[in-house]
């Protein structure tokens, strides 16, 4: 990330306790991982060290996230909202666990009964491509009768790669026809079948995101 001047902190509006809420967001898929509090000292420590430091209201002390568990958060970018009273940190979560329950995100509840981070914990909302890949992985690991995705996976490379070739040709034709709706639809078809191929070969969508981020040369979402 680009170095920030001390004036950055001076722009912020802290509450009467000298604190400001901070949202931690995954730097690749945009998933919201947690919310914590920061003060001037923790912000400065975060900027100096490159790892997220928060302020613990219960312990009344500086809190280096992951110092004990090993689940540290590498800072990728930091910004504040239009009122300068909320921070947004994009971070790289070590171990892919942000919550003390062991869940990836603290925002895993959404049902009538609490899951407490167990097997019923919800995955954090993310971008459409990440959500799609989750469904494909779920079909791979827990096949459903009549599922088109499972039919592709059962057919292996021959069936999957044939479909990628067919959809690629249709995408080319849509581009030649200069039809925006068809172009978008065919692009979506290619992406879906490509993700099925990735899942079939045990390659995660996140690996693809990491390659794209590295090629871009900037630790921010596109």
From Swiss-Prot:
Record EC number = 3.5.4.19, 3.6.1.31
- Which PANTHER family does this one have? HISTIDINE BIOSYNTHESIS BIFUNCTIONAL PROTEIN, HISTIDINE BIOSYNTHESIS BIFUNCTIONAL PROTEIN HIS7
Major localization listed first in the record, in broad terms: cytoplasm
Mention one GO molecular function.
Answer: ATP binding
* Location(s) in or outside the cell: Cytoplasm
Q: Does the keyword NADP apply?
A: no
What species is this protein from? Parasynechococcus marenigrum (strain WH8102)
UniProt name for this protein: Histidine biosynthesis bifunctional protein HisIE
Quickly give the catalysed reaction: 1-(5-phospho-beta-D-ribosyl)-ATP + H2O = 1-(5-phospho-beta-D-ribosyl)-5'-AMP + diphosphate + H(+); 1-(5-phospho-beta-D-ribosyl)-5'-AMP + H2O = 1-(5-phospho-beta-D-ribosyl)-5-[(5-phospho-beta-D-ribosylamino)methylideneamino]imidazole-4-carboxamide
Q: Secretion signal: which residues?
A: none
Family as reported in the entry's similarity comment: In the N-terminal section; belongs to the PRA-CH family. In the C-terminal section; belongs to the PRA-PH family.
Cellular component GO terms, alphabetical = cytoplasm
**Nucleotide-binding among the record's keywords?**
yes
Q: Which GO terms describe its biological process?
A: L-histidine biosynthetic process
Q: Which residues form a coiled coil?
A: none
Residues covered by region (Phosphoribosyl-AMP cyclohydrolase): 1-128
Q: In which pathway does it act?
A: Amino-acid biosynthesis; L-histidine biosynthesis; L-histidine from 5-phospho-alpha-D-ribose 1-diphosphate: step 2/9; Amino-acid biosynthesis; L-histidine biosynthesis; L-histidine from 5-phospho-alpha-D-ribose 1-diphosphate: step 3/9
Report the domain of life of the source organism. Bacteria
Give me the ranges of the annotated region Phosphoribosyl-ATP pyrophosphohydrolase.
129-222
Keywords of the record, alphabetical order, are:
Amino-acid biosynthesis, ATP-binding, Cytoplasm, Histidine biosynthesis, Hydrolase, Multifunctional enzyme, Nucleotide-binding
- What is the uppermost EC class here? hydrolase
